[in-house]
């Protein structure tokens, strides 16, 4: 009987949840969902100097924001150190590991000799077969794996295919340090085994680790999980991903106004494809995703594509959801608290009314917020330079006349104000644009905005007449 699929996402809490880690988490989550399995979350916090509680919280927060839920409790690797040492004791008893008393000077000499001779295997087996009675007094040994000296170590990888290493190039790696703390290589194997992990899906920078970890699995007589090493993410020019290219934390994308569903959709297409389809619902992603469809070549990050996808999802979102998302993003942006202070039942209703026009232009929530600035602006309205250039004496005089015409409108709506302005334009030999642009400048402080009659309706009669008065001349 086939075992249920168990994947795991195992970040190190030394910083934020970066974009590559987020994609790894997504691929693990998708594969678990597709197969009816589970995705577990393990925090690999054995590096006590670099692991921090804020980083752990940032990882958990990023996962929750991306809506990548995990099954069961979070496992903390450091808390399992006693179990890791227990496994090493069984390996020592079985002759699969040995105590190494080599000094730092001896190890340095081995490295230099290996480098000079062009060997990748640097440890020369100094203590591999020596009698323990020869151990120097007062020296705490490391524990090393008694790795095979000949033959091959082979990984049948779901993405990379068959990968072969010659065993004479692989060291007797350290399992326990002299202070008794387990190494990453050992801890990962023990934890994956004990957690019942069936599929290890991670970046291909871990491919060499797969060979070393397989040797530990073999020494313990444990079944190796299915391996899938996914390509790294590069910048648009093919170079290593940098902050300039998008190597940012998930929290930064939230603060830039991206939607979780858009980021998930973008990340799933970095290295994985399903024909020419670009836009996937979560359900479609789960149904279509499979490990062999992941390519081997590094994926290239493209901000323009991400923005385009985000704009699509903004346009597809219902208006009330967008008002809620706008309010949520204020917690993560500069001056967000000042903007939040202006939100009340009236301004929320205005945002909701304006949303159909606002969302057609916006590619991010920040652009949406910027477009909605006229709703939340205080009088006298700040006027941007392009709009200021249009506020000539002639235009200010026209604004005064437009205000007078609008003041006569009693039942205020987009339709009634449009009718009044069309009548004014016709009576004065003007095109509608010659009326709309002065109104736009006076009411929004910009030369672009949602439809001007929608703006009039959203702001309401009193606010519109007051803003027009601010810019008008007699």
Curated annotation (Swiss-Prot):
Single GO MF annotation: tRNA binding
One family name in Pfam for this protein: Anticodon_2
Localization: Cytoplasm
This protein's UniProt keywords: Aminoacyl-tRNA synthetase, ATP-binding, Cytoplasm, Ligase, Nucleotide-binding, Protein biosynthesis
The EC number(s) this enzyme carries: 6.1.1.17
Motif ('KMSKS' region): 240-244
Subunit text: Monomer.
Name the record gives this protein: Glutamate--tRNA ligase
Species for this entry: Rhodopseudomonas palustris (strain BisA53)
Gene: gltX
């Amino acid at each position: 009987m086939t075992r249920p699929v168990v994947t795991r996402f195992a970040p190190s809490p030394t910083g934020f949840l970066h974009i590559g880690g987020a994609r790894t988490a997504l691929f693990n989550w998708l594969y678990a969902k597709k197969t009816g399995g589970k995705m577990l979350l393990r925090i690999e916090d054995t590096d006590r100097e670099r692991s921090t509680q804020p980083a752990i919280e940032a990882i958990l927060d990023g996962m929750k924001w991306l809506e990548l839920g995990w099954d069961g409790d979070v496992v903390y690797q450091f808390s399992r150190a006693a179990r890791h040492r227990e496994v090493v004791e069984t390996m020592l008893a079985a002759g699969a590991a040995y105590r190494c008393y080599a000094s730092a000077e001896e190890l340095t000499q081995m490295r230099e000799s290996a480098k000079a001779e062009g060997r990748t295997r640097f440890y020369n087996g100094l203590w591999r077969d020596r009698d323990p009675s020869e151990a120097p007094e007062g020296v705490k040994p490391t524990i090393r794996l008694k790795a095979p000296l000949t033959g091959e170590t082979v990984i049948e990888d779901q993405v990379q295919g068959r990968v072969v290493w010659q065993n004479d190039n692989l060291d007797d790696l350290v399992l326990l340090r002299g202070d008794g703390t387990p190494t990453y290589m050992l801890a990962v194997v023990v934890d994956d085994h004990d957690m019942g992990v069936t599929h290890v899906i991670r970046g291909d920078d871990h491919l060499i680790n797969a060979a070393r970890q397989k040797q530990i699995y073999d020494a313990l007589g444990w079944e190796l999980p299915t391996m899938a090493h996914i390509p790294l993410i590069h910048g648009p020019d093919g170079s290593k991903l940098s902050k300039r290219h998008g190597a940012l934390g998930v929290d930064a994308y939230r603060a830039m106004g991206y939607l979780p569903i858009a980021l998930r959709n973008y990340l799933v297409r970095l290295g994985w494809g399903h024909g020419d389809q670009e836009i996937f619902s979560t359900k479609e992603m789960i149904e279509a995703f499979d490990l062999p469809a992941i390519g081997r070549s590094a994926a290239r990050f493209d901000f323009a594509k991400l923005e385009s996808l985000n704009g699509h999802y903004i346009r597809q979102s219902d208006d009330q959801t967008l008002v809620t998302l706008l309010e949520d993003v204020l917690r993560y942006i500069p001056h967000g608290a000042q903007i939040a202070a202006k939100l009340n039942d009236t301004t929320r209703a205005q945002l909701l009314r304006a949303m159909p026009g606002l969302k057609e232009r916006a590619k991010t929530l920040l652009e949406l917020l910027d477009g909605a600035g006229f709703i939340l602006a205080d009088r006298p309205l700040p006027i941007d330079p392009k709009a200021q250039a249009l506020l000539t004496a002639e235009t200010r005089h026209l604004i005064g006349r437009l205000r007078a015409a609008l003041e006569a409108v009693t039942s205020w709506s987009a339709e009634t104000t449009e009718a009044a302005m069309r009548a004014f334009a016709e009576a004065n030999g003007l095109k509608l644009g010659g009326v709309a642009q002065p109104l736009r400048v006076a009411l929004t402080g910009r030369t672009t905005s949602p439809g001007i009659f929608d703006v009039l309706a959203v702001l309401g009669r009193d606010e519109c007449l007051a803003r027009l008065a601010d810019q008008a001349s007699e």
